[in-house]
Amino acid sequence: MPSALVRALNERAHLPVVDETNIDAFLAPAAGEPDNAVLFFTGDPAQRPEADDVAVVLPELMQVFRGRLRGAVVRRATEDKLKARFNVVVMPSLVVTRRDQPVGVLGKIRDWSEYVEKISAWLSPDVPVMVSSGGPKVEITHAGKEIAR
């Protein structure tokens, strides 16, 4: 269950909640909408209390980048299915996208100036999109037998 601050992003800030069924539609901008979006991966607020801090910062970022950035909250139950696609390693994270491609990820809570500096840079049309890592590259073995990949 999301915290009250995360719920308020939908209720008060009118940020949509996206999941695997509607994220592609959200990331495809309608006529007149910016190509860039920010996705909020909250993680479990009970285990990651800084998610509430990011939930307070996000509406302020939306104000600063009004007209240049759209925002959405990723449904908690869907985060594990979507995090590899958007290069999310830690939670909470804000993912800045250009259409359906990530251009940057900010994990945990950051200093305000870092948010503004990095997001400003990522909104440039010249910034390359991130390449998915394809998952972990570590192989765990025991006595010569593969036990996990």
From Swiss-Prot:
It comes from the Bacteria. It holds the Pfam family HyaE. InterPro entries: NiFe-hyd_mat_HyaE (IPR010893), Thioredoxin-like_sf (IPR036249). Signal peptide: none annotated. Belongs to the HupG/HyaE family. This is Hydrogenase expression/formation protein HupG.
